Amino acid sequence: MNWHVAKRMGVVLAVALLAACKDDGGDGGGPDGGTTTASAGPGTGTSKAQPEGTPFTLPAGITLETPLKSFYVEDPRDCDDKDRDDAKGSGGAVTLCLIFRNTTGGPITVTLPPGLIIVSKDGSIQNGLLAQRVSIEVPPGERYFTPLFLYCANQDRATSGVGDEYALGPIIGYEGFQELYTLLEGKQLTRQAVTPIQLAITHLTNGEGLSDSDRAALKAL
């Protein structure tokens, strides 16, 4: 693999994602010069609270090494040399390496649902949101590595850096989110799709809801 080309592509994507995540339609200031709260619910937008939703559990026989950690996608030696071509999910504001163990004698499929939020252990780093359902077949035996790409859920926080720690959160279904999941269901997404999706998610997580242009862009993917 040409890591120089991959790195340049990764930088371009990261810049586009950051711009989309930061597109909050204003400067974040209140009328007195202070900050305003822009959030669809706990753990999204500017909220520092723990996300609320349906608990997520792994299938019997599957364990996941914790804490979950982000990794450097362009040099993925910390994720068993699996890169963006091996990744599940889309996005890129939060890039995690999941390490599973299957303690049974046969393969197990792990399904991660849309709306699953991965919670940063550092309040200055973004939580990550899964926008589409993904399935991961985990073979029996030793550690099985899977990169997972997620969208920015907090427009006022930094993107994930190497070694940032995360934990599995609940499946969130705040107002308007189910419409997003439905619009994206079953779509085969390209890297070019990431920016309009992130922009729509930023509108949702800030409590603004999807705009007509968001809906049109998502339907066109």
Show the residue positions of the predicted features.
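Bacterial N-terminal signal peptides that target proteins for export
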Residues: M1-G10
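C-terminal motif of bacterial Sec signal peptides marking the signal peptidase cleavage site
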Residues: L17-A20
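Bacterial signal peptide processing site
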Residues: K22-D24
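Terminal connector regions
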Residues: G26-G29, P147-A200, T205-L218
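Low-complexity, acidic Ser/Thr/Pro/Gly-rich terminal tails and inter-domain linkers that flank the onset
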Residues: G28-G89
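Short, solvent-exposed loop/turn segments enriched in Ser/Thr/Gly
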Residues: G91-L98
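Asparagine-centered strand-capping/turn motif at beta-strand->loop junctions
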Residues: L98-P107, L112
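Intrinsically disordered, low-complexity Pro/Gly/Ser/Thr-rich segments with frequent PxxP/GP/PP motifs
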Residues: V119-L168
